[in-house]
């Protein structure tokens, strides 16, 4: 009887040891760099504001941005308010116009056109379209580039490079314009 019991126990142990280990459920992947930019575009276009975002608007957009860019927005808003206090009859910088694209009037729509990502940074080219408000016909198209960094929660927008090639379109990067406005508060 002991031999039967020992054989049974041996067979049971062999069967159990061959069973594959259950691995934990895979974590849901963080959004891609392109997904982050698409989500930002949806959030921003639903807000429809111009110039620097106020505190409430900035809070809505903040989850899309890196800590560095969020700090630049806070500093630029403080610089803008300091400028208003010093020069109440002057129009402060970044008070109107679309600061998230090359076109002052803003885009009617934007979509991710190309993504180039490495382990820690990504570049996402967005194709923007501006439609004539009366006819709805596209009258301007252009690319701009979003620069992202990988944060703890995934990809975060760290800057925007203006690529519009017409007269009076902004040049350079959003971070530079924010820094210049922030310096007005010093």
PLM segments and residue spans:
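C-terminal motif of bacterial Sec signal peptides marking the signal peptidase cleavage site
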Residues: 13-15
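Bacterial signal peptide processing site
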Residues: 17-20
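Surface-exposed, charged secondary-structure patches
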Residues: 66-136
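Positively charged n-region of N-terminal signal peptides that target proteins for export
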Residues: 1-4
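Extracytoplasmic/periplasmic, Sec-exported soluble proteins
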Residues: 28-33, 50-53, 61, 116, ...
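Core segments of small alpha/beta cavity-forming domains
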Residues: 26-94
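Low-complexity, intrinsically disordered terminal/linker segments enriched in charged
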Residues: 121-125, 129-144, 151, 156-186
């Amino acid at each position: 009887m002991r031999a039967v019991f020992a054989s049974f126990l041996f067979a049971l142990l062999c069967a159990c040891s061959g069973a594959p280990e259950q691995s934990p459920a895979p974590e849901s992947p963080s959004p891609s760099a392109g997904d982050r930019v698409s989500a930002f575009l949806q959030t921003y276009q639903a807000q429809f504001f111009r110039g620097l975002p106020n505190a409430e608007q900035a809070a809505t957009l903040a989850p899309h941005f890196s800590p560095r860019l969020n700090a630049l927005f806070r500093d630029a808003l403080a610089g803008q308010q300091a400028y208003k206090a010093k020069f109440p009859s002057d129009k402060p910088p970044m008070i109107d116009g679309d600061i998230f694209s090359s076109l002052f009037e803003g885009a009617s729509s934007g979509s991710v056109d190309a993504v180039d990502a490495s382990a820690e940074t990504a570049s996402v080219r967005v194709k923007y379209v501006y439609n004539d408000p009366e006819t709805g016909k596209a009258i301007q198209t252009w690319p701009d580039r979003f620069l992202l960094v990988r944060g703890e929660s995934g990809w975060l927008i760290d800057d925007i490079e203006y690529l519009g090639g017409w007269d009076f379109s902004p040049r350079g990067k959003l971070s530079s314009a924010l820094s210049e406005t922030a310096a007005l508060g010093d």
